[in-house]
Every structure is written in C-alpha cells, then in structure tokens.
Amino acid sequence: MNPRFRGMGRGRRTRRALSRGGSGPAQPLNDALGRWSGVKITPMFGRWGYFVGARLFACFPLRSKQHDLWIRLSHDDQARALRDARIRPHRRFAQRGWVELEVTGPPEIGLALRWLHRAWAAAAKEPEEAT
C-alpha cells in the first residue's frame, strides 16, 4: 500500500502534449534538442524550457496555437540574429541577449535550430553560478 500524505489529494493527469513530447512545431524541436549533449527539456510556466545544466537557453510554448520561440544568445550573436527580419528582440529581456522567432513550420524550424545551436554552445561554455 502506498503511503498517503494529508492534503496531497489525487494528482492531475499528464496532458497528452506533455506525454508525446509536444505537439505542433514543438515536437520536432524537442526531438532535435533532446539529442544534443547535456540538454534537459522540461515544462515550465506554460512553455518548454531548454536547459544546459541549470542554465536556461531557450523556451517554446506548450500550446500548439502559440509559436514564439525565445532564445538566449550572446550579445554578438544577438546582434547578428537581429539582422534577419524574421527575428526580433525579446519584448522584456532583450538587454540580456534574448530574441524571439515565430516557428510555425519546417522552414522556421531549420532557422531556429541554427540559432538554438549557438545558444546551446554559449550556455554550455558559461561557468555554473554558485548558489
């Protein structure tokens, strides 16, 4: 018999999108990034969070109706990325190197993976912060 803790209640069921690894454009992104060394993919606050160690380097919405991929780049890469009309500065975190990109299908997934690879490499090189 499993011990029951007071106040825990019955947990919620896992949403189908989570159990399948995403839906819409998130699924191919999750499949690709899941094969990269050291990448951890976890749902957080309505978005897929892409981590290297404890460092968040990108996030994408869980809902298939939303398409805004957020990527954290180095400041040099951010300047390079913003030369492309399809990429815009993040509405709140542009000062920290974040950019946004609409990912609705295969053409944008290729572009996104190129910038995600740069973000992953930069995040993997950064030293872990002491907590």
Spell out what each predicted region is.
Residues M1-T131:
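Charge-dense, helix-prone N-terminal extensions
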